[in-house]
Structure formats: structure tokens, C-alpha cells
Amino acid sequence: MDRRIFGIETEYGVTCAAPDGRGLSADEVARYLFRKVVAWGRSSNVFLRNGSRLYLDVGSHPEYATAECDDVRQLVTYDKGGERILEGLVADAQQRLEHEGLPGTVHLFKNNTDSAGNSYGCHENYLVRRQGDFARLSDILVPFLITRQVLVGAGKVLATPRGAVYCLSQRADHIWEAVSSATTRSRPIINTRDEPHADAEYFRRLHVIVGDSSMAEPTTMLKVGATDLVLRLVEAGVIMRDLSLENPIRAIREISHDRTGTHAVQLADGRTMTAVDIQGEYFRRVREHVDAHGINDADPSPTTKAVLDLWERGLHALESGDLSSVDRELDWVIKLRLIERYQAKHGLELDDPRIARLDLAYHDISRTEGLYNLLAARGMVERVTTDLEILESTAVPPPTTRAKLRGDFVRAAQDARRDYTVDWVHLKLNDQAQRTVLCKDPFRSVDERVDRLIESM
């Protein structure tokens, strides 16, 4: 595909900590978080002026789905914009709690597991063409998605009967199938439920649910950018060596529990390879393809070059055992370094409760309390986007995709105080005429029908 539509859906963990331990339940906190949203949107499921969707998911998890983006860097920006929007909800909820004399501090975490062992997700969406063999696409992608955690995992301190261990991925231990149409019951790597949110005759949405939520901007860039490049490889018809794993679910756990990336996993054909070897094979094939053909016969963009550079440096760091070249860019390495410094300073074992609190605090989206955000404020991690672009993304839709039509419509309807209904493909004025515009092309940012609908308000 010359252009691809990307989107990220992030479920956030929520808690209300009180000094006496009697904080509000997650359900109660979620209601406070969404009071303001329900007040103006009459629902806890709304589309925003920036084209994104904000809603309360199953299990009291606030969820933010980015607007459609057609550029990886743009997606990183809108993903971060979601954090800022949710941070605003936290501030409002905190104010309401204090006004009502209720104790406790509300925290939102961009992570994937809670202390009770529940898991919530970060789902990546990639638009692919309907034509082509989706089963082949999935077969080639699964080993890549299982092994990419050595680079883009969020890191996690896991308590085991033999003591605490530092794992690469928060999500790996909660995945039960390679490919399935379910998202919660079996938690597959790729979800096959066919909801393209586009013209189903031409497009299909690849729904990847195995990934961890990322705090570090370069990690998000690599996670989505490398997956896009592998998809382009498949779409170009490049023949890949079969890297199918004998037992994908066992492999994803074993890889997560070995932070060196050197644990050998069994392939379906009887060979054994390490996660780094498998990732290296994908990287080399992608690099060869980009060097030979560019990206769709165009020169690689600065973002593509940055993705390839970080992918290569990450693999070299794992091969050499020296992670210093990526300890400002990859989440699991940034957090590991933070934990190691804290352990050394205070003489702590990995299973100390203070380490668990630090692990969690890394993912707090607060810019004043979240450890990742404090590192970013001090210039201790690398950036992909800017604070100004992130701020703009909270209010303005991406200008190059269907999200602009949706965002402009929502803004106009709200300003005109008109009753309206929107979803990913429909824009509707709830007046006597019930006028509706169907927007099936996610690449289209200009539409005379939408212009007329807005002018009629």
C-alpha cells in the first residue's frame, strides 16, 4: 500500500489511593473520570474534536482510540495526545473528589497488568488490502510479533514462586492463541474479527492485540514502524523463510522471561532459533527490500530511517549484552536501568514492594508524578515528537485522513449546539431529516457532502 492507515487503542489502568487504604473502587473512580464527558456527550462513549474516540471499556478501563493516522510519527503524537486528554480527566475527577470531601488520589496507568493479575490491552490497527491471502499474512507476522518484545516490550517485575524476575513483556503471559476472533476470552496475538471501518470490498483491518502499551516515544515508533515494514514486505510478495514456531504460546512466555534475548525456541520444522536471530532475519529482509526498492519506489522517509536505525541498534545491543546504546529509547531498558539504580542506592532485592511501586509509577501518565514523564522532562529519554505537537493533537484532527472530516463535523455540531451521532464511518445530524454521510474511505480528508452537512447547521 502506498499509504497505510494506523491507529492505536489503549486501555488504561485506574486506581484511587487513600492514606487509610479506603480509596474508591475502580468502578467509582471511572464514574468520576467520565462525569465531565457524560455531561457534554450524554454518554461514556464519545468521539472528540481531534477525531479520536474516548470511552469506558469493560472492567472500568478508560480507553482512548487514536484518530486515523497515515504516518508513524503522526501516530506517536496522537497516542501521546491521548495521555494528555486522560490526564485532564484525572485533574477534573480529583477536583470533584476534593470538593465532595472524599479522600484519595486518582492515578491512571498506561500499562497492561494490575496487582490482581488482570490484563488490559494496547491494540494496534493496520489497514491492509482485502485482496491477498490473510492467512499467509498472519503466518508470516506471528513469529515477528512474538519475538519483537525483545525490543518493544514494556518490561515488568513478575513475582514467581522462585522469586521476582524482570520480564520483557507485560502482555506475554496473558496471550493464549496465535490467531482468533476473540479479544478477551482467549487473547490472541492477531484478532481476526473482520471490522474494517472502511470499504469492506477493498480493505481489511489487521488488529494486533499482543503488544504492550508504550511510554517511550521511540518504542511506539519502532513497534508500529517495524510492523508496517514487515507488512510491506509481505504485500510486495517477498518470499520469507518459514519461521513458524512449534508452540507460539509457550515461545512468547519463554522469550519474555529471558531478557537477554538468547533463549532458543523450537520452530515448527525442528530447528531452534533465538528471538534475536528471528528478529534479525526479519530486519535483514526488510533492510534489503528498502535498499532495493525504497518504500513504494520512493526514498525512505526520515521516520523509516529512524525505525531501521533503532531496530538495528536494538538487535546489536542484545547481541553484545551492552544496552547503553538504547537505554534512552526502549521502554523495558529505560525501566530496568531505573530499577537497577534504585536497587543499588537502597540495597533492595527485586521482590521488594518498593520496586513494585516503582515499576507501576513508571507508567503513571501524570506529568508531575509519573516516572517516565519525569525522565522526559529532565531530557533523560529520547523524543520523537514535541510537546507543542502533542498539545495540538488533543484538539485538532490529523489533516490527511478521514479523521479530519469527523473532527470538523464534531466541532461544528458542538459549536452550533446541534444533536449529532458519529462513529468511525458515519456522520449524522439528529434532526427531522436525519441527514447522514457515510465516509468509507479512510484516506479521504476532503468531502463535499460533509462540507454541505456542516454548512447546513
Swiss-Prot record:
Pathway: Protein degradation; proteasomal Pup-dependent pathway; Protein modification; protein pupylation. Keywords: ATP-binding, Ligase, Magnesium, Metal-binding, Nucleotide-binding, Ubl conjugation pathway. This is Pup--protein ligase. Its EC number is 6.3.1.19. The lineage of its organism: Bacteria, Bacillati, Actinomycetota, Actinomycetes, Micrococcales. GO terms for biological process: modification-dependent protein catabolic process; proteasomal protein catabolic process; protein pupylation. Mg(2+) binds at residues 9, 55, 63. NCBIfam families: pupylate_PafA. The active site is at 57 (proton acceptor). Catalyzes the covalent attachment of the prokaryotic ubiquitin-like protein modifier Pup to the proteasomal substrate proteins, thereby targeting them for proteasomal degradation. This tagging system is termed pupylation. The ligation reaction involves the side-chain carboxylate of the C-terminal glutamate of Pup and the side-chain amino group of a substrate lysine. It comes from Xylanimonas cellulosilytica (strain DSM 15894 / JCM 12276 / CECT 5975 / KCTC 9989 / LMG 20990 / NBRC 107835 / XIL07).
